[in-house]
């Protein structure tokens, strides 16, 4: 109620309520300072007031109650006034612009707003990403002029993913930012947030270094979310071919110009590369099949390269395509026995393709760490498929062919090259390795142990002695463990989990124990058994007679003679596969499965 009303009620010394209003138990209001109250005048009654009490008397109960009522009325007046002004303001806006849509709610505060990082710290992390991490993920390039402030404004989710990846030296804070990444993905992909190209690039960066994530890791789940964005935006086809026909929309020309240029091409190539290379080693079906558009995109990027890495993308994709063709020879997808002749032919075809690929490479293999690691991993994968993955045929395998020895030597050579490369890196360089690189290293360690134990077989050791001596796997594993130990910290995240290198160290030590225990067992067995000596008795056997008929020029080409088959079955059925050892390294290379977690 207004001040004017309160003034008239306090104007004289009488009580504030006339006798008529008091009997009716209603409020008595006088519009003028003197005369009848409004109700008595309206009803034409005599308005009489009882005289008030003495001035020095204390306030009566009714007066205190009236004052409280007045205070509540004043508060109600203010609230009504605010509500009225807001309604008038909204009405005026609607009158001026009737088509205006409701304003978009402000996004939640990011890691800078919440105080987890300062903008200066974010700038340093962005520079570290550009200098250290970006060479190992050439699919999301951040140009040098870009600043933390501009990236935060234009691509907030990519900005968050980059900060998370670059915090490898502060694991607790990195895991905290990872939670922010999960919340953002849930808000944008599950609830009502925008699904954008920024989200796609951020997912690629988040997947690239997912070895730093808390366990269980969600590689497959994030990958499928990213592929859904690629499918919805039709980024797996040329821009001119997108939305060329719409069957349910009358205005099909609106989205024809959707394109993010070179950035989108790099991103799509990157998702294929990560999906194919990792799933192949982990024996999973790739979620992203090859399409010719990938090679077309790589050729376009290489023709007018903005970055040096643009010239390597085509070779990365071509090598991965070659690797996918090796899967055909693997017996892990079928229970049917493989024919030894067909397997040998497959091995030689793939070996020739690898040699031709290397010969036609337009730059040295060592120019790209990604390509060099991938090439020798493909060699090892061919060795794995040839020697261990297939089911032997019912008939006894051929022992007059040198190709199993070729495959074993190729595998030992590739393992030594990759492990030498790793231990010769500058200290702490491996913190920048992407997830695929660590999967490849885990595969190398696993297969190197198996190959070295197999090469110690007394029937084939003479053909492998030079390579096993050069590899010196026990010493090599010790040096790898020392490198990993330099990266282990005492930090723990909010759930009490240690950093990823702590777990890598444990697995390397278990691999070393596995290898050395079997090497020791083999040595003890060899001391108790006489080594086979080639003599007249061997030459007279029918099998060795066939071996002796191998042309000398073929022996010269492969660099060693065929091995005696009396004690040698190149499939090593009693040794491989070894489930215990595979479980040992399962968590290193497994993605998205909590069953292997320690």
UniProtKB/Swiss-Prot annotation:
Localisation: Nucleus
DNA-binding region, residue intervals: 18-47
Record-linked SUPFAM superfamilies: Zn2/Cys6 DNA-binding domain (SSF57701)
Keywords recorded for this protein, A-Z: DNA-binding, Metal-binding, Nucleus, Transcription, Transcription regulation, Zinc
Cross-referenced Gene3D superfamilies: Zn(2)-C6 fungal-type DNA-binding domain (4.10.240.10)
Domain of life according to the entry: Eukaryota
GO molecular function, one term: DNA-binding transcription factor activity, RNA polymerase II-specific
GO cellular component assignments: nucleus
Region of interest called Disordered, as start-end residue ranges on this chain: 87-110
Any GO BP: positive regulation of metabolic process
InterPro entries: prtT (IPR051089), Zn2-C6_fun-type_DNA-bd_sf (IPR036864), Zn2Cys6_DnaBD (IPR001138)
Protein function: Transcription factor that, with himB, probably co-regulates the him gene cluster that mediates the biosynthesis of himeic acid A, a ubiquitin-activating enzyme (E1) inhibitor.
Listed name of the protein: Transcription factor himD
Species in which this protein is naturally found: Aspergillus japonicus
């Amino acid at each position: 109620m207004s001040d004017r009303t309160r003034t008239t009620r306090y104007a004289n010394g009488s009580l504030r309520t006339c006798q008529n209003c008091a009997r009716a138990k209603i409020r008595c209001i006088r519009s003028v300072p003197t005369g009848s109250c409004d109700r008595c005048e309206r009803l034409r009654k005599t308005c009489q007031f009882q005289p008030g009490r003495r001035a020095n008397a204390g306030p009566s109960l009714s007066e205190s109650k009236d004052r409280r009522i007045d205070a509540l009325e004043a508060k109600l007046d203010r609230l009504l006034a605010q509500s009225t002004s807001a309604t008038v303001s909204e009405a005026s806006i609607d009158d001026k612009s009737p088509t205006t849509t409701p304003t978009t709610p402000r996004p939640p505060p990011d890691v800078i707003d919440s105080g987890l990082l300062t903008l200066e710290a974010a700038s340093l992390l962005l520079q570290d990403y550009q200098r250290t991490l970006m060479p190992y993920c050439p699919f999301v390039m951040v140009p040098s002029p870009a600043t933390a402030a501009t990236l935060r404004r234009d691509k907030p989710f990519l900005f968050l993913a980059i900060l998370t990846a670059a915090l490898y030296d502060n694991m607790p804070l990195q895991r905290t930012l990872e939670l922010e990444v999960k919340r953002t993905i849930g808000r944008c992909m599950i609830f009502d947030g925008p699904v954008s190209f920024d989200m796609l690039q951020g997912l690629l960066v988040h997947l690239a270094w997912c070895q730093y994530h808390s366990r269980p890791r969600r590689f497959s789940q994030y990958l499928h979310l990213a592929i859904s964005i690629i499918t919805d935006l039709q980024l797996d086809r040329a821009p001119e071919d997108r939305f060329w026909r719409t069957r349910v929309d009358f205005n099909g020309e609106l989205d024809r110009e959707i394109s993010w240029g070179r950035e989108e091409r790099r991103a799509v190539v990157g998702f294929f590369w990560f999906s194919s290379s990792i799933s192949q080693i982990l024996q999973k079906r790739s979620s992203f099949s090859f399409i010719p558009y990938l090679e077309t995109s790589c050729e376009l990027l290489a023709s007018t390269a903005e970055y040096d890495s643009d010239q390597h993308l085509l070779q990365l994709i071509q090598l991965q395509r070659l690797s996918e063709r090796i899967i055909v020879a693997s017996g892990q997808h079928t229970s049917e026995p493989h024919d030894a002749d067909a397997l040998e032919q497959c091995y030689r075809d793939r070996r020739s393709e690898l040699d031709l690929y290397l010969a036609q490479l337009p730059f040295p293999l060592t120019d790209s760490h990604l390509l060099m690691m991938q090439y020798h991993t493909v060699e090892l994968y061919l060795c794995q498929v040839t020697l261990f993955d297939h089911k032997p045929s019912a008939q006894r395998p051929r022992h007059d062919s040198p190709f199993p020895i070729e495959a074993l030597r190729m595998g030992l050579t590739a393992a030594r090259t990759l492990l030498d490369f790793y231990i010769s890196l500058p200290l702490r360089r491996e913190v920048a390795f992407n997830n695929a690189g660590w999967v490849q290293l885990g595969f190398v360690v696993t297969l190197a142990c198996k190959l070295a134990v197999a090469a110690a077989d007394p029937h084939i050791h003479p053909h492998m002695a030079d390579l096993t001596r050069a590899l010196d796997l026990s010493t090599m594993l010790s040096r790898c463990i020392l490198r990993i130990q330099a990266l282990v910290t005492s930090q723990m995240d909010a759930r009490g989990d240690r950093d990823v290198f702590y777990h890598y160290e444990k697995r390397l030590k278990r691999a070393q124990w596995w290898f050395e225990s079997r090497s020791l067992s083999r040595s003890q067995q060899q001391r108790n058994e006489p080594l086979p000596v080639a003599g007249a008795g061997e030459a007279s056997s029918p099998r060795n007679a066939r071996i002796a008929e191998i042309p000398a020029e073929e022996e010269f080409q492969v660099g060693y003679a065929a091995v005696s088959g009396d004690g040698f079955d190149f499939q090593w059925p009693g040794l491989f596969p070894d489930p215990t050892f595979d479980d040992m390294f399962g968590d290193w290379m497994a993605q998205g499965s909590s069953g292997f977690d320690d």
